[in-house]
A protein has these predicted regions:
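Basic, Lys/Arg- and aromatic-enriched nucleic-acid-binding interface segment
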Residues: 3-32, 36, 130
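Short basic/aromatic active-site micro-motif
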Residues: 16-21, 93-94, 110-130
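Short, cationic motifs built from Arg/Lys/His that form the positively charged side of catalytic pockets
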Residues: 17, 30-31, 59, 64, ...
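C-terminal catalytic core of tyrosine-transesterase DNA break-rejoin enzymes
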Residues: 23, 27, 119-144, 151
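Catalytic-site neighborhood detector that most strongly recognizes the C-terminal catalytic loop/helix
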Residues: 57-61, 141-166
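Active-site/catalytic core of tyrosine-dependent DNA strand-transfer enzymes
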Residues: 69-110
């Protein structure tokens, strides 16, 4: 079962918020401390009208910038509330961790599920696997050092095969002299 399609009863609002925060991390690469403190002031439009998230990381104070995917925009829209300064409802980390454990069981996942996996998923599956250069991913994640990004962004088998196919195609007519 895909985590994003997990049905959660309305009476479990706290679990719904946790699921949405985790999905937001998958679509933006934000850490928990950053996601729960993002406000409308962190959103801006580029010259083409696309909405971006621009924020200073709580952990490092480095700038993170990421263009918001439609899925992330939908999550922001779901929680639009003029009375709250943050984009998402507040949720303390202990509640989030407990809810992540419950959601893992509800989804039938055997592996532990922690919020930070969303950040790793963004780096590996959403960006690197789709051909975004690791240098760009590093800027999106707000890293000061590409070595840190390499911990997050793992090359998947799919990406490896696609890169090798491109390499073989590019070198097809190349005559190597050994």
């Amino acid at each position: 079962m895909l985590f994003r399609s997990l049905e959660i009863p309305e009476k479990r609002r706290s679990h719904i918020i946790t699921k949405d925060l985790f999905l937001f991390a998958c679509y933006t690469g934000t850490a928990y401390a950053d996601a729960v403190s993002i406000t409308r002031k962190n959103l801006f439009r580029d010259d083409e009208g696309s909405l971006w998230l621009k924020y200073r990381r709580k952990k490092t104070d480095y700038l993170g910038r990421v263009k918001l995917l439609p899925e992330a925009l939908a999550l922001i829209g779901k929680y639009c509330d003029d009375t709250r300064t943050t984009l998402f409802p507040p949720q303390d980390y202990h509640t989030l961790r407990a809810n992540m454990k419950s959601l893992r069981l509800m989804a039938g996942l055997s592996q532990d599920l922690v919020y930070h996996m969303g950040r790793h998923s963004f780096a590996s599956l959403v960006t690197l696997e789709e051909g975004v250069p690791i240098e760009t991913i590093s800027k999106m994640l707000g890293h000061s050092n590409i070595k840190t990004t390499q911990i997050y962004a793992r090359v998947t088998p799919k990406r490896l095969f696609e890169d090798m196919d491109r390499f073989v195609e590019a070198t097809r007519d190349l005559k190597l002299i050994l």
